[in-house]
Amino acid sequence: MMARGGEAMGERGKVRRMDNSSSESRDGSEGEESGIWRRGQDHFRHFSALLEEELKEETSIIQERWSSWSHHRLQASGLALLGLKGRMNGTLYGEDILVFEHPDRQHLGQHRFTHGDIVVISRSKPIGEKTVEGIVLERGPTRLRVVVGQRPKDLRKGTWRLDRGANRVAHDRMQEALEMFHSVEGDRGTILRDVLLGQVHDPEENASMRPKISGKFQRVERVHTELNPSQNAAMEAAMSRRLTIIQGPPGTGKTHTAVATLAQLAREGRGPILATAESNVAVDNLLEGLLNTGVRAVRIGRPVKVRETLRAATLDAQLEDHPKQDEIAIIRDETDEVHRALPKLKGREKGLAHRDIQRNKKEIRRLENEMIQSVLENAEVICSTNIGSGHRMLDGRRFPIVLMDEATQAVEPSSLIPISKGCRQLILVGDHKQLPPTVISRKAEQEGLGRSLFERLIEVGIQPKLLDVQYRMHPVLREFPSARFYDNRLNDGCTASQRPAPAGLLWPD
């Protein structure tokens, strides 16, 4: 469970000390003003309360739906599928794939289950009975394929119900990131804390300082003919500043610039680098671009949520092909033999057999951890969603450089997850004039959860590097957004003749 705002920060019975100091004392009221947080404690309490409010609202909506909506309304809204038969349909990197379909394999009808959604699997209702959570792998007209960590008992017996579920893991990881961000224990959090809270005299000057990252870097000539001048300027700033905001209006090549920056950082040996985004689609786009440029990139996250053509680059896929799998297979075979012999053993022999089983399990865990560390250490860039970067596999690993795409679509606590892994150089890519973060609770949104860290830092005074050439719109279509949102600074990278009207469409004179 997440700690409520104002309570002592703790995890599994441990209490962490929180740094309530600021680098500079200021007069005035406590709390946030114009993007500035005068005290870290206020920032922590504020966002802890908003996360709790958001979780409460999301849980309340789902519980209300499950307890009071009729089966007909749930199905008509596309939020539940009932009367489905289940069966096994293979595995995906060690997890079971289940197929759910009507007994006569008729069309499922209109529903809102899509790839990557969390589903709750139950017999008749998700309240009051044991449930299993899964993730949608694929949707078809007559069936859903769902990946589960543990399949339900008696899968082929009777029928099943599927409901759209809530993601508590995301809320828990955001709360933990808040605790890490404000912790003063060891090397937790980030050296950028003061500038991110706005507690420095001149935020822009502070952000422009060179990052303090130890290590030997190669000096590689930067020749980027594929970047236009504004993209190249943004990349150069990101390479030399401790905090850079890259603002990319529609069609200006945000992800293209992000990939070029990551590739240059990797070429100079500045890893390990953590590249994140709020959505799986955006992370996949970063990963694809990096792989195409020859960067050794590894994708963290369940393969079911990763684009099929990129799954070979996931950590799970690379672990499956790791040479140490042969050692693990031998140990598992030995363990299976001991299990088969157990019923015939008695007394001391049985005790020794149980000891051998436990010893083998411990050895398998050690080998699995070695495999994970070797794959991660070989990577130049590790790609993940913001939430995914809080996975236990990355516990204890520090990432001096963090690049975050889609930064304007992430609530601030989500952005803090990758940042709180020892970030010393931060690059935020996005556009606060486009989609804001998605927030369910109106109260939480109005009190600040709907504003991204990206936008707040601009309010503090950090100057964004604008990508000013767009390649998507007809020049006439560009005129309004350029004037309305970007101070007439947008230019065209395409001509009117390159954006003709669709054939057969009659335009009014």
Tell where the protein language model's regions lie, with residue ranges:
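Pre-ATPase regulatory/linker segments immediately N-terminal to the P-loop/RecA-like helicase/translocase core
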Residues: 5, 10-24, 28-52, 105-233, ...
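N-terminal pre-P-loop "Q-motif" helix
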Residues: 223-242, 257, 384
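Walker A (P-loop) phosphate-binding loop of P-loop NTPases
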Residues: 251
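Motif I (Walker A/P-loop) of helicase-class P-loop NTPases
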Residues: 255-263
